[in-house]
């Protein structure tokens, strides 16, 4: 009997010891500076207030209609609160927009259409699942139509200046066909034949009255949302300084090449740059060599 009582006492002592240990641990945790706080977060999430008068490439956006207003509101919310992508786009604007603006002025394309490049590729040489490439997401057939060279060694869809010029010419052609820059943007996304077919079937000639695919239904609104944020980022909570923005890649000289380069690495080193620098400034060069046909001249950018 005494042994049983002794064992019971030992059990109670052990239980009390464990209980006190747990209580002590909890007390220490509550005092640690790493304890979770349930204080309100020091930020506020706001809805987006739409302006009463919004235009796209000089054409009115009928935000007085609830359907149009809500479609734009959706894209504004998505782009405003997609923080990392929006910040990267803001940083890249200073690098690429001046060149786009200059080429568009020369080709008579409204400046608002520069935001199409963000909607298409986020200002990068992207590759889509359908095979579209570059800043302007040209497919091979359209690229060739507007003078971009594509072969095993070269893809000028990745040539920023040339592809921007081609995009401007394509948009101008679409505007001539549809009589509207808004419809031109929609046609750029879904293709002119498909857009014309939808317009004929629905007997409508205004983008905002058309019922198109989900992607094209959202496309112009996405460009509009990007435009609103990019032109006044502080209104949407983005406060970037000049030092935050990426520098333009405009300090380079042009070297004309009229004969085959068996090694682009050797060519780079001969011009006192690295192979990587050569590729960064000339992403249209696909391989490590460049065959050049007689009479052909390629202009390669060499950073200073």
Each model region followed by its residue ranges:
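Substrate-binding/active-site groove segments that recognize
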Residues: 131-152, 164-167, 171, 195-198
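Primarily a LysM-type cell-wall glycan-binding module
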Residues: 243-272
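An acidic, Gly/Ser/Thr/Pro-rich helix-cap/linker signature
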Residues: 2-108
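Short, functionally critical alpha-helical segments immediately adjacent to catalytic or ligand/cofactor-binding
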Residues: 109-124, 184-190, 278-281
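Catalytic cores of secreted or luminal carbohydrate-active enzymes
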Residues: 214-237
